[in-house]
C-alpha cells in the first residue's frame, strides 16, 4: 500500500484544527519557504508534498465547513498531487494583481502547461499536467493555476540529488520564455520527495 496516500485518518476534525490553525499556518509558511521557485516575473512553482496536501485539505474542510463524511471527494482531488516517490509535483501559478493585465496576459499563454520543464545536466523533463480539467480554453486563454507532475527515472533522481549538477526550471512558451536555477537549499528540500 502507498503510505503517501492521504486517508481520512490523516485529517483531524474541524474543531481540533481550529485550535491549532494559527500555529499550523506558521509551520506551513516555514515549510514551504524552500519549495517555491519563481520562473520569470509572474510564474511561480509551488512544489507539493504529502504535508502540503494535508494542509490544503484541512484548510478547505475548515473554511468550507466540510464534514468528515464529505471529505472523500477532497481526498480524491488532492491525492493525485502527492508526489509518489518518483516524481515532483507542483502547482504553477501565474500571479498578476491587476485583473485586466492578468486577463490580457493569460490570453497569450495558451498551452503554457505543456512548456514547463526541469533541466538536469542538459536533460529536459517536461511536465505532465492534470488533464481532467482543460487549463487552456479553445480561444487560447490559459488558466492562472496549473497542476504539474515531473516524472523521474532512477538515473534522473540520482542526477537531481548530485550537488555537482546544475538544475534549472524553465518555461519555453513563445510568449513567456524564462529559466531559473534551483538553489542547493531548494534542491535539498525537493530531494526529500524521492524514495
Where are the predicted features?
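Long, contiguous binding/interaction regions
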Residues: 1-87, 95-195
Amino acid at each position: 500500500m502507498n503510505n503517501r496516500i492521504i486517508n481520512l485518518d490523516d485529517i483531524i476534525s474541524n474543531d481540533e484544527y481550529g485550535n491549532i490553525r494559527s500555529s499550523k499556518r506558521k509551520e506551513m509558511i516555514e515549510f514551504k519557504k524552500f519549495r517555491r521557485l519563481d520562473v520569470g516575473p509572474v510564474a511561480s512553482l509551488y512544489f507539493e508534498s504529502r504535508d502540503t496536501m494535508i494542509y490544503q485539505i484541512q484548510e478547505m474542510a475548515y473554511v468550507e465547513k466540510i464534514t468528515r463524511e464529505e471529505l472523500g471527494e477532497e481526498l480524491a482531488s488532492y491525492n493525485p498531487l502527492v508526489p509518489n516517490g518518483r516524481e515532483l509535483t507542483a502547482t504553477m501559478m501565474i500571479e498578476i494583481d491587476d485583473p485586466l493585465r492578468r486577463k490580457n496576459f493569460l490570453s497569450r499563454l495558451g498551452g503554457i502547461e505543456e512548456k514547463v520543464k526541469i533541466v538536469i545536466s542538459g536533460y529536459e523533463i517536461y511536465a505532465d499536467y492534470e488533464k481532467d480539467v482543460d487549463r487552456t480554453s479553445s480561444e487560447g486563454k490559459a488558466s492562472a493555476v496549473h497542476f504539474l507532475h515531473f516524472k523521474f527515472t532512477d538515473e534522473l533522481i540520482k542526477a537531481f540529488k548530485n550537488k555537482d549538477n546544475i538544475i534549472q526550471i524553465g518555461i519555453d512558451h513563445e510568449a513567456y520564455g524564462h529559466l531559473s536555477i534551483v538553489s542547493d537549499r531548494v534542491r535539498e528540500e525537493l530531494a526529500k520527495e524521492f524514495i
